[in-house]
Every structure is written in structure tokens, then in C-alpha cells.
A protein has these predicted regions:
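Core AdoMet radical
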Residues: 106-121, 128-149, 154-219, 228-235, ...
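Catalytic cores of alpha/beta
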Residues: 175-182, 238-251, 308-319
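Auxiliary Fe-S-binding modules of radical SAM enzymes
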Residues: 7-11, 17-60, 129, 253-378
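An N-cap/entry alpha-helix motif that binds or orients negatively charged groups
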Residues: 46-83
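Conserved, mostly hydrophobic/aromatic
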Residues: 44, 71, 99, 138, ...
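Generic structural signal for well-ordered alpha-helices
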Residues: 87, 125, 152-156, 179, ...
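Glycine-rich, proline-tolerant flexible connector loops at the mouths of alpha/beta enzymes
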Residues: 86-89, 139-148, 200, 266-275
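Canonical Radical SAM [4Fe-4S] cluster-binding loop centered on the CxxxCxxC motif
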Residues: 79-120
Length: 378
């Protein structure tokens, strides 16, 4: 687990109920180059490799506070002090892939496999709807049992019952034809983390049968079809460098996704990366802030992984420019089995507990949870 976070700016409610950053003078000992670089990145909505290196090396409290404050200001211009909430349904932990970092990889014989039925998933949606969720995220491994027909039937059923809700799919690499079928059935969004945009790094994380080119093509296919598209990567994955992170940011700039999901790499004991060091909260928060500065309107989650490496991780993510949280709606008896990484939080809480816990956490830092679809705002 991470140590206590570095100090960050306290926030209070302004008269208009939008979160207001308490102004504190920047100490003169903060490197002026850092402040200037942050302002340049914000204004240009782009970053060079040299600028990225400089910002990721910030280690003084004032520099870290400044970049996070600037990211929050940028986020609030579009989204105010509203945190968008999604209900996560992890419906299968079967997967045909063998990614070296993932606890549900094909060759992990220790994984306790499960699949939810359509009825179970609709029950999750029903309880979620009552709790105010208006986006459902259906996430799972690449499981051949769930054919295109089954996915389309499920999406159609959810949209028919809850026409005011968005359905997000996160079920991996498929053909363009499959993606089109899901879209025509009513799916609104699709999350597909690219994990790394660097070819050599991709090969360190995945077996030979998987290809970065194919994953990138999937993202472009999804965008062309008309989805709100999400990509993303782990922070601190084995083999990651400042140079590979720069490639990630360039891919994001090229793709212009509606969502970017990043969180710290956390090892899982039954994978080839069991003994690898986890990514840090500090670097994750800095990267959240950088992504917000260069993509002001992007939907940016404060992930469960961030909450796993620090008890206040999700709050700190919001205070670094994130604006989405995804409490778990999955049945409690399967949550522990969806073990992408170890020590995952909130596996024993009922959906209502997760919902109100999240609301209270956000209130504690001056934010409100929005009961809406939470679409991307241009």
C-alpha cells in the first residue's frame, strides 16, 4: 500500500455550489520552468517528450499541487463539481487471451471461473436503476460463450427496459461487423484499453498471438461506427518508460477518444508478473492531471485500482482532474472471482453500500454524484 499522499489543496463550496479551489500563493521556490511548462501544455493541449519528462519528475509538494489544481480547474469548466457515476457489471471472467499481467488470463488454473446469466445481469441493472445509475458498464473477458447474438440480445433487453440509460461494453477485441451489431442493438459506448502504444512494450505484456496493430484497428473501427470510445493504459506496467508513456499520449491525441481509463498496474499472484512492483499513486495522479490538461473534455475515471493502492485513491483522482467513478453492481458472490489484480477493494459490499459510500466520499471533497447518463460534453 502507498504511504499517505502528498498534501493537496483543500476545497470548499462556492456560492454557486461549484467546487472552488482555495487560492494559495505558489511558493517562489517552485521551479518556474515547471509552472511555465504546465501552462504551455494547458494552452496548447499537447505535450512534448521533454515536457512529459519534466512533469513526471515533479516531486515537490507545490509543483504537484499546482498541476493537480490546474487540471481540476480545466475539468470544472466543462463538468462543474459533478462526478459522473457508472454501474459496473463484471459478467464473465472466462477469457481466451493470456495477457501476462491479468488474473483472468486463459492459463491461470487458479481462477474460479463464472458467468452471469441474462437474468442476473438484468437484476443488476434493476437494482442499479433504483439507486440512480443511468449508465451500465458490461465488462468481461473475451469469452466465446457470449456470442454476438447473446450480446445483442442482452443490450437490446437493457435498452428496452431502461431507454434513458446508456450501455457501455468492455468485452475486448472483436470484428468490425460484431461491433456494428452491438451498436445497432443499442450499445452507446465501448471501452478498450490499448495498454501501451509502443510495439516493443506491447510484446512484453502480451503473448505472440496478440497484436498492437489489431487493437488499434479495433479502436478506429469503434470510432468510425459511432461509439463513444474509451482507450487507456496501466501506469507502471513492467517495461513502461517515459518514452512509452509519450507514445500513449500521442495515440490518445490522434484517436481523440471520449474516455481514457488509466490506473496503476497492480500485480496478481497467479500471473507471470506476480513479483513485479506496482505502479505508484503519485505517477498515476500526475498522469491523470496531464491527460486532463491536454484533453479538457475527456471522461476520465478515478479507478478502482487507484482506490486499491491508497484508501483515498479515488478522491485524490477526482482532485487531479478525473470526473468519473464506477461502483460495482455485480452480485457480491462473484466479485472476488473477477480478480484482474490482487487486493481489489469493495468485493464484499452490496450495490447500495457502494453507491452511498461513493456519494459520501465525493461529498467529503466538495463534489456531488450526478444522476444522469453522463455523456461526453463537446
Amino acid at each position: 500500500m502507498e504511504s499517505e499522499p502528498k498534501p493537496f489543496t483543500q476545497i470548499s463550496q462556492g456560492k454557486n455550489k461549484h467546487t472552488k479551489i482555495e487560492e494559495k500563493p505558489i511558493k517562489t521556490n517552485m521551479n518556474e520552468e515547471i509552472k511555465s511548462t504546465i501552462n504551455k501544455v494547458k494552452q496548447s493541449r499537447n505535450i512534448s517528450l521533454e515536457q512529459l519528462k519534466l512533469l513526471l519528475e515533479i516531486n515537490d509538494d507545490e509543483g504537484v499541487r499546482f498541476i493537480r489544481e490546474e487540471a481540476v480547474k480545466v475539468c470544472q469548466k466543462t463538468y462543474g463539481n459533478r462526478v459522473l457515476i457508472r454501474g459496473l457489471i463484471e459478467f464473465t471472467n472466462f477469457c481466451k487471451n493470456d495477457c501476462y499481467y491479468c488474473g483472468i488470463r486463459r492459463s491461470n488454473s487458479q481462477a474460479d471461473r463464472y458467468r452471469l446469466t441474462k437474468e442476473q445481469m438484468l437484476d443488476c441493472c434493476a437494482s442499479g436503476y433504483e439507486l440512480g445509475f443511468r449508465t451500465f458498464v458490461l465488462q468481461g473477458g473475451e469469452d466465446g460463450y457470449f456470442t454476438d447474438d447473446k450480446i445483442c440480445d442482452l443490450v437490446s433487453a437493457i435498452k428496452e427496459k431502461y431507454p434513458d440509460c446508456a450501455v457501455t461494453l468492455s468485452i475486448g477485441e472483436k470484428s468490425k461487423e460484431s461491433y456494428k451489431r452491438y451498436f445497432d442493438a443499442g450499445a452507446d459506448r465501448y471501452l478498450l484499453r490499448h495498454e501501451t502504444a509502443d510495439e516493443a512494450h506491447y510484446k512484453k505484456l502480451h503473448p505472440e498471438e496478440m497484436s498492437l496493430a489489431h487493437r488499434k484497428q479495433c479502436l478506429w473501427d469503434l470510432k468510425e461506427i459511432g461509439y463513444q470510445v474509451g482507450c487507456g493504459f496501466m501506469v507502471g506496467s513492467p517495461g513502461q518508460t517515459v518514452e512509452t508513456l509519450y507514445e500513449d499520449l500521442q495515440l490518445i491525441r490522434e484517436l481523440q477518444p471520449h474516455m481514457v481509463g488509466i490506473g496503476p498496474f497492480i500485480s496478481q499472484k497467479d500471473t507471470p508478473f506476480a513479483d513485479k512492483a506496482s505502479g505508484t499513486m503519485e505517477q498515476t495522479l500526475k498522469l491523470l492531471a496531464i491527460i486532463r490538461l491536454i484533453h479538457p473534455h475527456v471522461l476520465l475515471p478515478a479507478t478502482t485500482a487507484l482506490g486499491t493502492i491508497h484508501p483515498k485513491g479515488r478522491e485524490l483522482g477526482i482532485l487531479s482532474g478525473a470526473n468519473v467513478v464506477m461502483p460495482n453492481l455485480s452480485p457480491v458472490n462473484v466479485r472476488e472471482k473477477y480478480k484482474l489484480y490482487d487486493n481489489k477493494i469493495c468485493t464484499g459490499n452490496e450495490a447500495a453500500e457502494c453507491r452511498y459510500c461513493m456519494e459520501n466520499r465525493m461529498k467529503s471533497i466538495g463534489y456531488e454524484v450526478a444522476v444522469s447518463r453522463g455523456d461526453y460534453i463537446e
